[in-house]
Amino acid sequence: MKHMNGIKSLIVGLIFSQVAMFSTSFASDTNQSDAEVASQVFNEVKKNNNWKLAFLTAKDAQVVFMNITPNTNPNNEIGIETHKFDQIIFVIEGNGKAILSGKTTMVKPGDMIFIPQGVEHNVINVSAKKPLKILSVYTATDIPANSSYQKKSDVPQE
């Protein structure tokens, strides 16, 4: 239980630090969002039909909506990736599998996936018919501000 309290403290601290970063974004930088209260954000995630949508962007954080379906990515998954920054994913709609460092866990609406930097991960939609909609919080910028990609294949390759 002591380990879980430490994890909870880490998550709460990370979320509060990200909120603080959002509130200090600079309006003069057009690549950043202004400080904002986003009402009913999970409903906005459900409305998103794009592969990826940059919802809010700050200097060192970003909120991205994702819609994982065979229409947006024929593989019906994010794809194996590793980041130089932390990532927190909230499952909003649909069911999936989260693979973190080779360990698979089934996920459903209301679940959170915490991914520290450097951890190899993938999120897979387990339904060929229903979308898997997620909200992802990055502790860095993952895609350009105000970007929207209808399909995974639309994302510029690095």
Task: Please provide the spans of the model-predicted regions.
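Bacterial N-terminal signal peptides
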Residues: 11-21
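Short acidic-glycine-tyrosine-enriched beta hairpin
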Residues: 102-117
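Conserved short histidine dyad/triad with adjacent acidic residue
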Residues: 65-82
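Bacterial N-terminal signal peptides that target proteins for export
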Residues: 2-11
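A short, N-terminal "cap"/entry segment at the start of jelly-roll beta-barrel domains
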Residues: 19-64, 149-158
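Glycine- and acidic-residue-biased ligand/ion/polar-headgroup-sensing regions
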Residues: 85-96
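Ligand-binding loop in jelly-roll beta-barrel domains
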Residues: 118-144
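Short strand-coil-strand connectors
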Residues: 59, 99-103
